[in-house]
Amino acid sequence: MDIKRALILFLLFLVVLSNAFVDYIISNFNHAVTCRKPTYFGIVLQGIFLVILFSIADYLINENIL
């Protein structure tokens, strides 16, 4: 993994685990957030979002768009 992919992965990790992401995205799913903290289901959703976003970013890097 080159430095660009590692940096993108780190930034996506920070975004997906941020309070704003939990409050505005994850909280829209039923039983994913309790007391502004993700439940086990919410944590799984965060992982799924991280994988999807990193796959998109990896594709964009491979196509020299990023």
Swiss-Prot record:
**Ranges annotated as spanning the membrane:** 41-61
| Keywords of the record | Host membrane, Membrane, Signal, Transmembrane, Transmembrane helix
**Which of the residues are on side Cytoplasmic?**
62-66
Could you tell me where this protein is found in the cell?
Host membrane
Q: Which residues lie on this side of the membrane: Extracellular?
A: 21-40
Q: Which N-terminal residues, if any, form the signal peptide?
A: 1-20
Q: Which family does it belong to?
A: Belongs to the asfivirus B66L family.
Q: What is its main location?
A: host cell
- What is the native source organism of this protein? African swine fever virus (isolate Pig/Kenya/KEN-50/1950) (ASFV)
Its membrane topology: Single-pass type I membrane protein
Output the Gene Ontology cellular-component terms.
Answer: host cell membrane; membrane
Lineage runs: Viruses, Varidnaviria, Bamfordvirae, Nucleocytoviricota, Pokkesviricetes
Q: What is this protein called?
A: Transmembrane protein B66L
